[in-house]
Design a protein with these regions (language model features):
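Hydrophobic/aromatic beta-strand elements that line small-molecule binding cavities or substrate pockets
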Residues: 14, 55, 71-76, 89-91, ...
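Flexible, glycine-rich phosphate/dinucleotide-binding loops
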Residues: 36, 45, 92, 116, ...
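Short beta-strand edge/turn micro-motifs at domain boundaries
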Residues: 101-140
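Short, cysteine-centered beta-strand-loop-beta hairpins and adjacent loop/turn segments enriched
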Residues: 92-100
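General beta-strand recognition
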Residues: 35-37, 84, 124
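Short, low-complexity N-terminal intrinsically disordered segments enriched in polar/charged residues
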Residues: 1-29, 136-140
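A solvent-exposed, acidic/Ser-Thr-rich amphipathic alpha-helical stretch
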Residues: 2-5, 23-78, 88, 100
């Protein structure tokens, strides 16, 4: 499998884990030092642990549950051992007993794990940036 296909698979696995509420697989797709920028939060999350704490709070206090998540319009730009993955994402989730639907655009930066690292050769996400979809665009 070429590197572009490896990144596409890593991204598909990440989205699938998110869609399935598979916390272990979802956070396992990110490096420990990953950062996260979500337009719905006032501040960036500067580690995987920080995001996991927030995720667990959402689940315990707000009944957070992902009901569906689909990716479309994927694009990969390889930059050596770094890959930039861009896609449109449609998400359905439940919080505080209410269903929410969102259409967003997301950039995920993947880094190929170097030799000697525990997950050598795997592409792990090291940054995620979620943006609101511009108004007036048709749904995917």
């Amino acid at each position: 499998m070429n590197e572009r296909d490896q990144v596409l698979k890593a991204a598909a696995d990440l989205v699938s884990a998110f869609a399935g509420n598979d916390r272990e697989a979802y956070f396992g797709a990110f490096s420990a030092d990953a950062s996260f920028v979500f337009y719905t939060l006032e501040q960036p999350l500067l580690s995987r642990d920080a995001y996991q704490v927030l995720w667990d709070t959402w689940r315990s206090e707000d009944g957070f549950e992902v009901l569906a998540c689909t990716s479309s319009n994927a694009f990969v730009s390889l930059q050596g051992d770094v890959a930039i993955f861009i896609h449109d994402v449609a998400t359905e989730l439940r919080m505080q007993g209410e269903q929410h639907f969102s259409q967003e655009r997301e950039t995920i930066v993947f880094k190929k794990q170097a030799s000697g690292q525990e997950q050598q050769g795997l592409w792990l996400a090291c940054h995620e940036h979620l943006s609101a979809m511009p108004e007036g665009l048709p749904p995917p």
